[in-house]
Amino acid sequence: MKEKGSSFSGSIGFVLAAAGSAVGVGNIWRFPYLCAKDGGGLFLLVYLVLVLTFGFVLLTTDVALGRKTKKNALRAFESLNPKWKFLGHLTFLVPALIMTYYSVIGGWIAKYFFTYIISDGKDAASDGYFTSFITSDIAPVVFMMIFLALTAWIVFRGVEKGIEKFSRIIMPGLILLIVIIAIFSLTLSHTDTDGTVRTGMQGLAVYLKPDFHGLTVKRFLEILLDAMSQLFFSLSVSMGIMITYGSYVKNEVNLNKATNQIEIFDTGVAFLAGMMIIPAVFVFLGKDGMASGPSLIFISLPKVFDAMGVFGRPVAIAFFLMMGFAALTSCVSVMETLVANCMELYHKPRKKMCGAVGIYSLVTAVLICLGYNKLYFELKLPNGSVGQLLDVMDYISNSFLMPFISLLTSILIGWVIGPDWIIGEVERNGEHFKRAGLYRFMIRYVVPVVMLILFLVSTGFADLIS
């Protein structure tokens, strides 16, 4: 069932909510690492080209599909072609899997924010602090529950009064915090015991200057795949979120303009995240100090904050507050997608479905927390990495399902339904879709090929073939 009046009030509300979904912890803990690893400005250039081509195609497809059908992913694909009903069910699985662990990560962020509020944070910078926390029995569950309760409360309030209102308040604050921390990072300097001086501006050069040293065709393809995977996960596509948010967009909204603004917003935040983190890590830990994922946020950066001296604690508080905003906006979008799909599937009101999804999220998140102690195991994944329960959920959703869903969606839109179906929705109010020709070419030929390659690489099939 679709709620009466379940829609964003206008274009701004939609853009801020969608950008909030796209701007998650992945933008902040993965984008800077890939920049440092993949040639700085070279990676930035490749990423920007992909945003303007590949990114806009996937984003436009999801949003237009949602608005045209006024349905969530579970029913939207079925309304296009009953034979493709299964694609809606596959898409529904992605947020269902992501929801199992996203509130756990949100709880980690809440814990570090609380630590810096009540202390100078020196414990957080010590070796083994993060491992000790996530392997404990009670603390991770408590902080996860706090984060999950806040997420559920926002979703419970509905689209306009909950998600849109929250996004209008939080997103400007998130951007302001990122800009302030980024500017501060550029002013930093540090002298090692051997007299070597490193500055934030030198770190900025590491970030922006293209590094072509040792570049080969194989190396460029690796950079291309890294940029593609980052873009793919950054824009919240192929997980039903943008289809759901698209179904809340009013018909009079200029869809082309709105999706362009989301692209700019998401790319801008990713760029600022790199400017915020790379110079700071470079100053205190050197060029080889960059890490990815939880290691960057919860191990490397606390050491950087500790090395800042008197400025470390306020910067850490601002940083983890900003991280909390980013995690919360993304988690809200994941939970809203589950709630909206369940409302449509079971024909129950928001309050009941929010309660049901909340219970599901709590139970599964507790299991993820226990995956670091009582239920700990190590499993070698098909892509060669080794992980435990959280990593398995992340792998299935991000590395397996999302590329596969994008591949199938491009085939459905490009060859079964036809690109003009999406283009017609974008031009619903007489707007000119300037990139219509590019969209046709990309959705038919480029997206299927690239998504197939990404799927084969991320699932390990490429290594088996070679």
Which residues are covered by each model-predicted region?
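Membrane-interface "cap" regions at the ends of multi-pass membrane proteins
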Residues: 1-29, 58-63, 67-79, 85-86, ...
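Membrane-embedded translocation segments of transport machinery
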Residues: 2-8, 168-328, 332, 352-353, ...
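Inter-helical loop and helix-membrane interface segments of multi-pass membrane transporters/permeases
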Residues: 2-6, 34-38, 71-90, 103-162, ...
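Transmembrane helix-boundary motif of multi-pass solute transporters/channels
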Residues: 10-48, 241, 257-260, 264-267
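Loop-to-transmembrane helix boundary motifs in multi-pass membrane proteins
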Residues: 13-14, 21, 137-142, 265-271, ...
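Membrane-water interface regions at transmembrane-helix termini and the short interhelical loops
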Residues: 34-38, 64, 79-80, 86-99, ...
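Hydrophobic alpha-helical segments of multi-pass membrane transport proteins
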Residues: 327-333, 354-368, 372, 391-425
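A generic transmembrane alpha-helix motif of multi-pass inner-membrane proteins
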Residues: 383-414, 434-466
